[in-house]
Amino acid sequence: MTDIGKLATEQRNAASEHIDRLPTLDMVRLINNEDKKVAGAVEAVCPQIAGAIDGIYARMQRGGRLIYTGCGTSGRLGVLDAAECPPTYSTDPERVRAVIAGGYGAMFAAVEGAEDDRSLGANDLKALHLTEDDSVVGIAASGRTPYVLGALDYAKSVGALTVAVTCCPGCEAEAHADIAISPAPGPEVITGSTRMKSGTAQKMILNMISTGVMVKLGKVYGNLMVDVKASNEKLRERCVRIVRQATGAEDAAARAALIETNYACKPAIVMLLLGVDKTGAETLLTRANGRVAAALEG
C-alpha cells in the first residue's frame, strides 16, 4: 500500500511556503518560475515518450485504438486530447477516445469515490471491448490511483499495450504498465495541487503522444495539418493557406481545388502538384495509405 504522504506530488515546495504573503506580481513570478521546471522534467523522459508513440502507432496500423483513462484533472486531460484528434486529424472518434472515472459528469464536477474503485477502471474498459491491438494510456499524477491501476491491469490481461503517465518516478503504476513515463516536475506551488505542474507535464506528454502517432500515420505533410476537418469558416480558410503553402498555388487555384474536394486538403494538394483530377488524386492517396509525400512520389 502506497504511503500517500510520501508521494512526490504531496511534498511541500520550500519556494512557495510564504506565497500567501506575497504581492500579486511576485506570486505570479513564483508560479511562472516553478512552471519553467516542467519542460526540463518532460525532456528527461523523451525516450519513454518515443517508445510509447512507436508502440501505439504499430497497433493503430493494425486497426487498434488509443484509449486514455484517468481521474479528475488527469482524466480531463485525456478527454481533452482525445476530443481534439477528430477536428485536427479527421480521425474516427472511436480511434482515439478517453474514459474518465465517474463518466461524463466528472468532466465538470468531482465524482466522489470514483477514483478509489479498481474494478470500475477495469469495467469501463471492458465496456469498450478492448483487444490486443489497442493501447491504453493510464494517467495519474500520483501513480497510485486505484481506478487507473485497475484499468491498466485489465488492459494487460487482454494483451493491449499499457502506458502509465505519472509525475512520481518509482511509483506503483510503473509496475502495472509496459511503458512508464514519469517526469519529476517537483512539488506543487500549492501543496498537492496536481492540476498545476503535474497537469502541465501530463498535458505536454499527451500532446507529444497524439501528435507523434498522427505524424507517423501520415496525418501531416511536412508540418502542415493536411487532414484537418474544415467544419467552420476559420478552418476552411486554414485549408486554403495549407494548400497554398504546400503547392505554391495562387489563392484562386487553391480555393477551386478545395471546393472540388469538399475542402479535403490532401487530394487538393496532389491535384495541384501532379496535375491530376480528383479521382486520380484520391487513387494515388489510397495507394499511399493516405500519405501525401508518398502519393507525390508515385
Where are these regions (language model features)?
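Short, basic, glycine/proline-bearing loop/turn elements
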Residues: 34-44, 110, 135-138
